[in-house]
């Protein structure tokens, strides 16, 4: 196809069609990085802008190359093994080829003389594929192709399916491009197919990269899981040893507690007998104490009655004092409230007076600021006047000097004799110089 395109003298816009053929046929064994590099090198940016239709000669050349390609793809389809072919895709391909053959003979009126255009398209006929199948030749070809065991190992089912899908896709794209070239003289369908295929390949590469990252993560997680399992096993072993140690301690504690229980039982029996003796003695003592307490309570009741009478009298006195102090509190609070009201009124009057004073102070400050501004203006004006006067005096002095030096008007400087001699000498020197020149 490259030789056909170079021989057809196509413009540069038509060259991306060859890129699709080279990109779609990558082997499946290449790594992801190599695929990405080849895809980046092979991708040529094609914008779906409005393309100018090609010339009739270019259309005919490209159509011839594309028809040759479709014929080769259809032959490849028939060479494929029967058990891996898709019958439906073959029938659809045959229908498209028949339709293309009919349209190629009809849609020739792209130029003024249809006889010259239709002549190169008519002799390009579909290869006679049914004749190849006659006499069992197709089965013989298959037997020859797949006779060796190496071919059987390489051409597995998945590879054949992928080849068949790629072949069908390429055939469809070329067919649509051929129809568009014959109808409109452009190949936008080819550019669109290029863009879609490029996007699908980039998505495929991204999927492969994500899968590799996932595998790496799974490997790292498996390593972590093994490490965790080892740690857990070591921890379980340590805990089992600790449990055995605790069981030994438990047996020792049980034996120790049994001995302590026997000792405590005997000890408690002795203590009970001793406490019973003590209790009998203490009971006698408590009875004596109860009698004493009874006498004491009678005396306390009598004292309590006397204290209660005394407290009632004191309570009455305190209530009278409380009434007195409550009345005094009311009077004092009323007096203090009056004083507070008087202080508030005085505060309000003082506040009003302070506000008036603040207002007066602000007015005085404004007057002072205005006076300072006025003084500053007069000072600047005085300085300006002085500056102007000095400038005028300097200007007058300069003018007087200029008038005197240049003898303007009636002003002339007195000339001495020596000066006249010098002037004459200078005149003679000037005349000598002029003569030399």
Swiss-Prot record:
Pfam families: IQ. Keywords: Calmodulin-binding, Cell projection, Cilium, Cytoplasm, Cytoskeleton, Differentiation, Flagellum, Spermatogenesis. Transmembrane segments: none annotated. It comes from the Eukaryota. InterPro entries: IQ_motif_EF-hand-BS, IQCG. GO terms for biological process: cilium organization; sperm axoneme assembly; spermatid development. Residues 1-41, 102-121, 410-437 are annotated as: Disordered. GO terms for molecular function: calmodulin binding. It is found in: Cytoplasm; Cell projection, Cilium, Flagellum; Cell projection, Cilium; Cytoplasm, Cytoskeleton. Disulfide bonds: none annotated. Residues 388-417 form the IQ domain. Belongs to the DRC9 family. PANTHER family: DYNEIN REGULATORY COMPLEX PROTEIN 9. This is Dynein regulatory complex protein 9. It comes from Bos taurus. The lineage of its organism: Eukaryota, Metazoa, Chordata, Craniata, Vertebrata. The gene is IQCG.
